[in-house]
């Protein structure tokens, strides 16, 4: 990126105001949506072009929506991606609605990454994590012989960094992701590591 483009992006991040205008009456919390962020950022673009795209990614036997936000001046560009997993069953929603809701969540968080918005402690973040990682109670506790979640994540990250066989990478990912059941932060980071490595392998293919 040129210094001028970097300065424009930094200026947007500094002045962007995206208040939490949405309210979840069931959970009784406020949150910001993808649309709230877009409404706040559009007046600040001033000639820059912002686009968001979705991609359905199959990891193991589950589908994820990968959203990528890109801002460009025509010569320089900067992108950020985020992924969210589709629920197998979502009460009161058909398949299209599930995909749409998952897309909105992924889009919100790729915009967060692009513009430096921290929603890590938002209630809707925790709610989505709980929906994604729901498992029987007996599976949420590690047995005494199970490795610590930090060790599992570290080992997977080191393995993923050097593995070039996509099939083996997916098998290892599925195994380690299951080991991290009940540890939301480590599971999320595991997914992020997997997503980054898959993108790297696509680029060299």
From Swiss-Prot:
Transmembrane segments: none annotated. Coiled coil: none annotated. The keyword DNA-binding applies. Residues 131-145 have a biased composition (Polar residues). GO terms for molecular function: DNA binding. To phage H-19B erf. This is Essential recombination function protein.
């Amino acid at each position: 990126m040129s210094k001028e483009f970097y300065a424009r992006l930094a200026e947007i991040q500094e002045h962007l105001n995206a208040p939490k205008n949405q309210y979840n009456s069931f959970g009784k919390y406020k949150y910001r949506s993808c649309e709230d962020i877009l409404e706040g950022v559009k007046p600040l673009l001033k000639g820059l072009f912002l686009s968001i795209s979705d991609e359905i990614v199959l990891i193991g036997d589950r589908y994820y929506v990968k959203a990528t936000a890109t801002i460009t001046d025509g010569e320089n560009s900067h992108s950020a991606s985020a992924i969210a997993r589709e629920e197998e069953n979502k009460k009161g929603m058909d398949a299209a609605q599930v995909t749409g809701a998952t897309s909105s969540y992924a889009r919100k968080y790729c915009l967060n990454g692009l513009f430096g918005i921290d929603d890590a402690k938002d209630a809707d973040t925790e709610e989505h994590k709980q929906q994604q990682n729901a498992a029987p109670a007996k599976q949420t506790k590690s047995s005494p012989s199970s490795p610590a979640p930090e060790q599992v994540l570290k080992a997977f990250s080191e393995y993923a960094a050097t593995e070039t066989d996509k099939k083996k990478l997916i098998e290892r990912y599925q195994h380690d992701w299951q080991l991290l059941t009940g540890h939301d932060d480590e599971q999320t980071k595991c997914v992020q590591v997997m997503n980054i490595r898959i993108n790297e392998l696509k680029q060299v293919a």
